[in-house]
Amino acid sequence: MAPPWVPAVGFTLVPSPGGFLGTQYIRGEGFRWYASLQKPPWHPPRWILAPIWGTLYSAMGYGSYLIWKELGGFSKEAVVPLGLYAGQLALNWAWPPLFFGARQMGWAFVDLLLTGGMAAATAMAWRQVSPPAACLLYPYLAWLAFAAMLNYRMWQDNQGRRSGRRLSE
């Protein structure tokens, strides 16, 4: 049997590989394209994004562990709270290919709205099971709201730059 800390570490790390794979769209031509876009003055500096996402992914991952543990693993009761979590995580991972890969800022904005809605539903479901787990999602919800505003503003400010390109660079 695995030591008791293994599930906590495993769940905490689950969101990170998808986030890491998403960074592949931000390299090379994707980065050059992004650098050429008009950005609002409140656009965050590039260096802060990795620490922010690392923290948010770790918090949501650990929150999912708390839910899993509280509900006795992958039980019938865990289907909705962990299913909502998995759904919002899949939507989260879809954003970089949409924005940077396909260069579809409008569809990326829709994806962020859906991600935010699913993440809010996840937080509400988690609150019924473990209020501390739900609290771990609150910074993520705030960041998603900020990211949606930024995505929308960039989409509107770069009207001529929103046509799609190939997904692979």
From Swiss-Prot:
GO cellular component: endoplasmic reticulum; mitochondrial membrane
Protein's membrane topology: Multi-pass membrane protein
GO molecular function terms listed in the Swiss-Prot or TrEMBL record: cholesterol binding
UniProt keyword Transmembrane present: yes
Keyword terms, alphabetized: Lipid transport, Membrane, Mitochondrion, Receptor, Transmembrane, Transmembrane helix, Transport
Spans within the Cytoplasmic topological domain: 27-46, 101-105, 156-169
Principal location: mitochondrion
This protein's record includes keyword Membrane: yes
Residues in compartment: Mitochondrial intermembrane: 1-5, 68-79, 127-134
Transmembrane parts of this sequence: 6-26, 47-67, 80-100, 106-126, 135-155
Protein's GO biological process: lipid transport
Source domain of life: Eukaryota
Pfam families documented for this protein: TspO_MBR
Subcellular localization(s) per the UniProt record: Mitochondrion membrane
Biological function: Promotes the transport of cholesterol across mitochondrial membranes and may play a role in lipid metabolism, but its precise physiological role is controversial. It is apparently not required for steroid hormone biosynthesis. Can bind protoporphyrin IX and may play a role in the transport of porphyrins and heme. Was initially identified as peripheral-type benzodiazepine receptor; can also bind isoquinoline carboxamides.
Similarity comment: Belongs to the TspO/BZRP family.
Oligomer and partners: Interacts with TSPOAP1. Interacts with MOST-1. May interact with STAR.
Protein name: Translocator protein
Lineage: Eukaryota, Metazoa, Chordata, Craniata, Vertebrata
Gene responsible for this protein: TSPO
